[in-house]
């Protein structure tokens, strides 16, 4: 997939490099309370990617890609790159990680199903789905992060 979108990927990579340099200029950005914001940011980005990728099963089937396996591969590569900037990485190998991403995906399916409902059943389904998604996200946030010693110099390299 990255071969087909090479130019877009290179552009996104350049944005990441610029972001990394900005983060490196002020160590306060990656310490103290900001570590929690980093964890929130990474968790939100990864969870969003997982849910969105699972919304397109025909696309992934046409490419011959399993979106769950693909997601874990992208999470691993992204985590490796983020180690150069952030003092933590997410524990994507924790059993709760995939389990809660699947719960978020199911909550998203339930929300989509509620679009075809009316009345009280639609309200209850939407409320339940949002609650389930929120609880799954909180569970993802409570997975202990892995500490990381950020290297003095940053050398980001494209992984594809």
What are these regions (language model features)?
Residues 1-160:
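Non-heme di-metal
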């Amino acid at each position: 997939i990255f071969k087909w979108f090479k130019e877009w990927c290179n552009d996104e990579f350049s944005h990441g490099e610029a972001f990394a340099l900005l983060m490196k200029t002020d160590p306060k950005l990656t310490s103290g309370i900001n570590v929690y914001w980093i964890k929130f940011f990474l968790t939100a980005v990864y969870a969003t990617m997982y849910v969105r990728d699972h919304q397109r099963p025909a696309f992934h089937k046409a490419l011959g890609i399993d979106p769950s396996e693909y997601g874990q591969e992208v999470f691993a590569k992204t985590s490796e790159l983020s180690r150069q900037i952030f003092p933590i990485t997410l524990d994507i190998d924790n059993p709760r990680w995939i389990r809660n991403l699947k719960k978020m995906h199911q909550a998203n399916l339930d929300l989509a199903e509620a679009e075809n409902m009316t009345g009280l059943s639609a309200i209850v389904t939407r409320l339940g789905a949002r609650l389930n998604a929120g609880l799954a996200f909180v569970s993802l946030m409570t997975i202990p992060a892995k500490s990381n010693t950020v290297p003095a110099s940053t050398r980001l390299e494209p992984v594809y």
